[in-house]
């Protein structure tokens, strides 16, 4: 949540700011509408251009630079930059369809991102377990630390792979439909940017597949046996029932979204319509 909630707050602020800049009558107070709205309306076109430029840069930087990363957190950071590109692209258009795509993308990104970090945290707990002395959690830092995890924690690896495939936009997972919704909403206005987004997403999918290849098809040659002194007591891994349940529920939502998508889609549609005044 520490890494996810600030991004959501900034994106929601940009959503409101994009409406003010483009002159849409959204549900703001009269004072705010008259002051901030009048301030940014003359800069509507430059603001939209800025969002489009930032979107394209996010696609290129997030996917191309991410290919050279070998640390897990840095790779996920550039992955986030790529996802922000899709949301900025939807904000730049500011139509009912694009806002609906923005809301849906934000929801699926939050679910997938939380599931990814919960799974990585569970990897650390499951690998080392709890010792009564210090440092009870092994932190996964490098991509090579994920080698052969399928042979140790198959269920966690499957959950992690589902999140990675969703972030890569592979059907029929939730991430695919989110990207499709955003690209469809902007395809008529900015088809060239849609092409850039598709090409860079295909390139960026390779580093997600690299992680899957490490977990499923390579064995860890390092000795991962926990060495303890006689005074140390190795207890059960610190993966609580709540932790496991949240991972299981999020994985099911991401993977089985296709079979019952009406609830989330209708909610996003109603929310986007509520932002526009008739």
Regions found by a protein language model. Give the residues of each.
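Alpha-helical transmembrane segments of multi-pass membrane proteins predominantly involved
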Residues: 1-278
């Amino acid at each position: 949540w520490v890494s996810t909630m600030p991004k959501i707050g900034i994106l929601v602020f940009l959503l409101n700011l994009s409406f003010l800049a483009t002159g849409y009558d959204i549900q703001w107070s009269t004072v705010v509408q008259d002051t901030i709205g009048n301030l940014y309306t003359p800069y509507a076109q430059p603001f939209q251009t800025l969002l489009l430029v930032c979107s394209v840069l996010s696609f290129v930087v997030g996917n191309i630079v991410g290919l050279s990363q070998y640390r897990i957190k840095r790779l996920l950071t550039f992955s986030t930059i790529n996802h922000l590109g899709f949301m900025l692209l939807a904000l730049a258009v500011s139509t009912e369809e694009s806002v609906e795509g923005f809301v849906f993308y934000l929801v699926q990104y939050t679910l997938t991102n939380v599931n990814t970090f919960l799974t990585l945290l569970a990897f650390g707990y499951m690998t080392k377990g709890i010792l009564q002395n210090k440092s009870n959690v092994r932190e996964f830092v490098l991509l090579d630390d994920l080698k052969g995890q399928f042979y140790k924690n198959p269920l966690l690896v499957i959950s992690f792979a589902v999140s990675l495939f969703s972030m890569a936009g592979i059907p029929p997972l939730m991430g695919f439909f989110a990207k499709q919704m955003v690209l469809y909403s902007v395809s008529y206005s900015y088809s060239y940017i849609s092409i850039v987004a598709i090409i860079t997403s295909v390139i960026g999918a390779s580093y997600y597949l690299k992680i899957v290849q490490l977990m499923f098809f390579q064995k860890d040659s390092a000795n991962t046996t926990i060495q303890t002194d006689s005074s140390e007591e190795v207890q059960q891994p610190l993966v609580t029932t709540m932790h496991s349940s949240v991972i299981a529920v999020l994985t099911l939502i991401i993977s089985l979204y296709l079979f019952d998508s009406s609830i989330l889609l209708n909610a996003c549609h109603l929310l986007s319509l509520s932002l526009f005044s008739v």
